[in-house]
């Protein structure tokens, strides 16, 4: 190693002085290497240093830079304003808290100006820490294979250091644990989670299990719940990929979160607009029901009817029927609403489905909604010789609603009449007169044995084919 002089040492900070020493005292270069001179200034003898020990200075400076970078990154992550969930594998909140303390302590140790101790074999003492960290990471890897996944949600204002373990709650949703700071729910007190962990937490009807964990949001997937937790921090729910809007809507309704355009953000605008249209159609039809439809239903009920047939016409439609020749399809029993807005509302099939669901919720029966032809005015009259004249009306396609509030519509009158048995009614023969003659023959019952006993005995009138034993059934 010291067989020939080196013109320049990369570890030296003053190359001119080194050249001067090289020309003035050339013999010392053959006695001491550059590495031994550097170590002699530090006061440590490394004459028997191995190759690993010789490169320890470079590794030590590199480790210092990495540890300082890690400490800066960790402090930057703790003060980050965005609430990003991090995935950790822990067995309990207490163990997780101890692991975080050990990590903070280990990250702050290399950044101290105190020099590290060298082992007799030339290795640095931080190698033991790295081996412990590697063993810990291997144990964490085994936890990952076990399938226990924890999402930690913290409040960005307080920071991770100010949150104690007792101030966190663990929510179990779809076999996934979410470690959440309950203070994030106070921003939305009208939601289900805001009521559970808000000011009235002592009156909460949901109790934790034996491990102190809360099982909430039954039937909601972990991916959907993770997106909903972002709502308590940012006020916006971003629909994850692969999750349908109806599924997200059902989860929002379960957790009492308003489903509005300012709350939901997704790529499928068609599905989002469809859900928003359903909400708007429900509110609009409830208004139409109270203002336009219900008065006509009351008028039908006051006249003794138990059903109502309503036709929706536009404001420009004109109904002009001939009093002498009215339509012959029963349209005279229909109620009419002149409203172009309601006509446009029922033009869409989705709106008719929403209206039908609202009427079912209000207790009505036999609900039919659709579009049918309705006669407006008389076009011409065809007169037939010796018969009734035929009237031709102009028909327009308009929406209609038919509903009933009859309570006994499920009973069959035909079955009730068949079950009646009475011998005191004498007009049954008159009622049976409407039955065809061929059915009367089939309906006559055959004589029974006990009826033959009371029948009068008549002498045989030349009927030789009759069996004599049949005259006396007792024989």
Swiss-Prot record:
Entries under CDD domains matching the protein: BTB_POZ_BTBD10_GMRP1
Basic residues bias locations: 22-31
Domain BTB: 167-241
Positions of region (Disordered): 1-143, 455-475
Localization annotation: Nucleus; Cytoplasm
UniProt biased composition (Polar residues): 81-94
Lineage: superkingdom: Eukaryota
Tissue/organ expression: Ubiquitously expressed. Highly expressed in adult brain, testis, aorta and small intestine and weakly expressed in the heart, lung, liver, kidney, pancreas, spleen, thymus, prostate, ovary and colon. Down-regulated in glioma.
Protein name, per record: BTB/POZ domain-containing protein 10
Keyword Nucleus appears in the UniProt entry: yes
Biased composition annotated in UniProt, kind: Low complexity: 108-142
């Amino acid at each position: 190693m010291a067989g020939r002089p080196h013109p320049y040492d990369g570890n030296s900070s003053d190359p001119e002085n080194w050249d001067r020493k090289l020309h003035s005292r050339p013999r010392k270069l053959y006695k001491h290497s550059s590495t031994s001179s550097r170590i002699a200034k530090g006061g440590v003898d490394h004459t028997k240093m191995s190759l690993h020990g010789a490169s320890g200075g470079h590794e030590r400076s590199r480790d210092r830079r990495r540890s300082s970078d890690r400490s800066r990154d960790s402090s930057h992550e703790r003060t980050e304003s965005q609430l990003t969930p991090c995935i950790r594998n822990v067995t309990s909140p207490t163990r997780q808290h101890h692991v975080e303390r050990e990590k903070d302590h280990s990250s702050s140790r290399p950044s101290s100006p105190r020099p590290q101790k060298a082992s007799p074999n030339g290795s640095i003492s931080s190698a033991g820490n790295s081996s412990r960290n590697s063993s810990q990471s291997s144990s964490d890897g085994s936890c990952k294979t076990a399938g226990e996944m924890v999402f930690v949600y913290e409040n960005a204002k307080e920071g991770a250091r100010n949150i104690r373990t007792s101030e966190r709650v663990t929510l179990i949703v779809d076999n996934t644990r979410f470690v959440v700071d309950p203070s994030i729910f106070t921003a939305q007190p009208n939601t289900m989670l805001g009521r559970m962990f808000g000011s009235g937490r002592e009156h909460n009807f949901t109790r934790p299990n034996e491990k102190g964990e809360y099982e909430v949001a039954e039937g909601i997937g972990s991916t959907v719940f993770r997106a909903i937790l972002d709502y308590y921090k940012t006020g916006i729910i971003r629909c994850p990929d692969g999750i349908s809007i109806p599924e997200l809507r059902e989860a929002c309704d379960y957790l009492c979160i308003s489903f509005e355009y300012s709350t939901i953000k997704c790529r499928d605008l068609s599905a989002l607009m469809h859900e928003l249209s359903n909400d708007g159609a429900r509110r609009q039809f409830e208004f139409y029901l109270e203002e336009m439809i219900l008065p006509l239903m009351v008028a039908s009920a006051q006249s003794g009817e138990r059903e109502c047939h309503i036709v929706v016409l536009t404001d420009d439609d004109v109904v002009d029927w001939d009093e002498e020749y009215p339509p012959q399809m029963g349209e005279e029993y229909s109620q009419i609403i002149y409203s172009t807005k309601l006509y446009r509302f029922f033009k869409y099939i989705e709106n008719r489905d929403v209206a039908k669901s609202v009427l079912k919720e209000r207790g009505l029966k036999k609900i039919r909604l659709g579009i049918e032809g309705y006669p407006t005015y008389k076009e011409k009259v065809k007169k037939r010789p010796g018969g009734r004249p035929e009237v031709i009306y102009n028909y327009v396609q308009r929406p209609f609603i038919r509903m009933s509030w009859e309570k006994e519509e499920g009973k069959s009158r035909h079955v009730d009449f068949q079950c009646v048995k009475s011998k005191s009614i004498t007009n049954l023969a008159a009622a049976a007169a409407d039955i065809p003659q061929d059915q009367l023959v089939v309906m006559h019952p055959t004589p029974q044995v006990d009826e033959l006993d009371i029948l009068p005995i008549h002498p045989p009138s030349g009927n030789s084919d009759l069996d004599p034993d049949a005259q006396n059934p007792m024989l």
